[in-house]
Amino acid sequence: MKNKHITPARRTSLELLNKILVSNKPFEKIILSSKKFLSLDDKDKRFTRLIITTVLRKFGQIDFIINQFIKKGSIKKNNLKNIIRIGIAELIFIKSAKYAAINEAVETTKINYSNRLSKFTNAVLRNIDRDKEKLSSMITDEMNYPSWLIEDWKQTWGTKQTKEIINYFQKEPYLDISVAGDPQEMEKVVKGKIIYNKTLRIDEIINPSKLPFYQTENSNYHWWVQDVAASIPAQLLINSDKIKIVDLCAAPGGKTIQLLKANKKVISVDVSNERIKILEQNLRRLNL
């Protein structure tokens, strides 16, 4: 049967989620080695990432919700459980249209299993949607972390700071970029905010390739994706002379680019061939 009813993003999300949860391989490695994911258009890539990261980030809460409606161990097929997990992620957290989220989960179950199990998926998700306000009041972000880790954080940082850590990790990550030129000028150009030295934060969730000057010969407008914390170690090395620098786990290349822009010589190493290709692409984009 052709899976004509299932959008490419949801179909790919299920396939990748299945691999992530059984392979014990890094999220990015599985994503970047997936021909299906790489063949998606930008919109579907973003939605696929959103679905998968939401399921992973809210995993404990999602499984708590499942356990309110299904006896533990009653779903023998992990693939089916992941279909329901994606449906819950869409209904409760992503706020997808109810019809789209439920209908596509039902169709996916029908294609992968049977009409009988598709009715099961339909019943579970409709019950969850009906009770979603009550369920939302029952779940906490702490459910997404092992209890031993929560206790360790509380002993180390205290209860208040632990809550702040959890809240931070539950948010969609910001997009930080480092700039080669004047950060105040680039702040206006990319509509970001200077948060440290030459690091700008873009609050909008956006594909970096859509930002101004993604491709430019003018080195004054060069920028690259780099978390603010990742920029600090390289900053400490920039004023050091006559040192050899090896950047381990270098991809996607933020620290390498930062050091090359400061006229340092760098040996960049990464265990992943896929990520090395991304590093090379980023270096070529900036004529390095």
Name these PLM-found stretches.
Residues 1-288:
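S-adenosylmethionine
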